[in-house]
Regions:
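Alpha-helical segment proximal to the catalytic Tyr-Lys
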Residues: 127, 170-175, 231
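C-terminal helical subdomain
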Residues: 181, 197, 201-233, 240-242
């Protein structure tokens, strides 16, 4: 087994029917891992799993539904016998605009999905398996958790908090469980579409490496962090952004601001 080989390990990835989540599921499966991916609907979860292979199981589970999360963990243990990797990828941003324009309903939704759900899934996985046997957790945060971005204050606040939760969990769960965050920059996903779709050329030129990221760019980093090659890494927030935030803060703005 090489240090990047994931054979014999089992991963749960939330929100993995498309985009970064799907790319991570594909990459981990290619590395030999069994993968359980979740989506909000059974149809989307099954379709995503079918794209990848026989060692992948799709399950319907809304990120904040604790009963669904428990069921997913139970089924994973019954089917594959372990939970070695958890990637908390599910996220939402229903709240573009100024912070002073937000209401409690929006606040509650974005914090529940982006912050509470990763903590809940981690807690359940630790109690069911990882606490005794070890494992690796990745929380998908954002460069927005480290740098200001116009009109995304509430989303960014959840990602800043998630980075702090990641570090706290890394401390509390050591030495059995490693916990890290990945902070993607602008990636070609449906969630981020409003930030680049109508201005791809100028946005790309503002990134040091000259292009918007692809989901596979994040997937490669995730595969490294959950592997033995990263066995001495915990509590880190790894930025994967093509040099987007080198120098000044990001210059792009969401088209819906007007």
């Amino acid at each position: 087994m090489t240090s990047l080989d994931l054979a014999g390990r089992t991963a749960i990835i939330t929100g993995a029917s498309r985009g970064i989540g799907l790319a991570m599921a594909q990459r981990l499966a290619e590395g030999g891992a069994n993968v359980v991916l979740t989506a909000r609907s059974e149809e989307r979860a099954a379709a995503a799993a079918a794209q990848i292979g026989s060692n992948v199981l799709g399950m319907a589970a809304h990120a904040v539904d604790e009963d669904a999360a428990r069921h997913c963990i139970d089924v994973t243990l019954e089917r594959f016998g372990s939970i070695d990797i958890l990637i908390n990828n599910a996220g939402t941003n229903p709240a573009y605009g100024l912070l002073t324009e937000q209401d409690h309903a929006r606040f509650a939704k974005v914090f529940d999905v982006n912050l509470w759900a990763p903590l809940m899934w981690t807690s359940l996985a630790v109690k069911a398996w990882m606490g005794e046997r070890g494992g690796s957790v990745i929380n998908i945060a954002s460069v927005g958790g480290l740098h200001l971005t116009p009109s995304m204050g509430m989303y960014n606040a959840t990602k800043t908090a998630l980075i702090q939760v990641t570090k706290q969990l890394a401390l509390e769960l050591s030495p059995k469980v490693r916990v890290n965050a990945i902070c993607p920059g602008l990636v070609r996903t449906r969630l981020a579409e409003g930030l680049w779709k109508e201005q791809e050329d100028p946005v790309s030129s503002s990134i040091a490496l000259g292009r918007i990221g692809e989901p596979v760019d994040v997937a490669g980093a995730a595969a490294f962090l959950v592997s033995d090659a990263a066995s001495w890494i915990t509590g880190e927030a790894m930025v994967i952004d093509g040099g987007q935030v080198l120098g000044d803060a990001p210059t792009f703005r969401r088209n819906a601001d007007d």
